[in-house]
């Protein structure tokens, strides 16, 4: 069975403010269910490992969409005990995905283990994807891009 690595934030504050943030649940849950329904095994990892902070705004008002509500109703443990990024081997996975939320801008964007992981995926020509603020977590290594060809 093919495995997908989903890298999420460990950061729970909006910058240095007291305002809570973290993973935007909808951006995780919709993709998580899609991956599982497509026959993939999903491994969740974060810089600190353990419980993943969920942005409380993603649980308010109109935001908990159908996939988020399904994820919560299942009492799914996927976000309860993320693996530490330092323990992850990119060679073990077929693809890498970063869901959003504001947290990745503070921890993943500058995390050396994250840079090692995404570089490993690029070096192996494996797919890397991101949704919304998850793109801030992809410190694209310059060396992984070929020289442009001029014709």
Where are these regions (language model features)?
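Extended, subdomain-level signal for the structured scaffold at the beginning of enzyme domains
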Residues: 1-124, 137-151
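Conserved, well-structured core segments that form or line functional sites
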Residues: 127-129
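Short, thiol/selenol-centered motifs that function as redox-active sites or metal-ligating centers
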Residues: 131-135
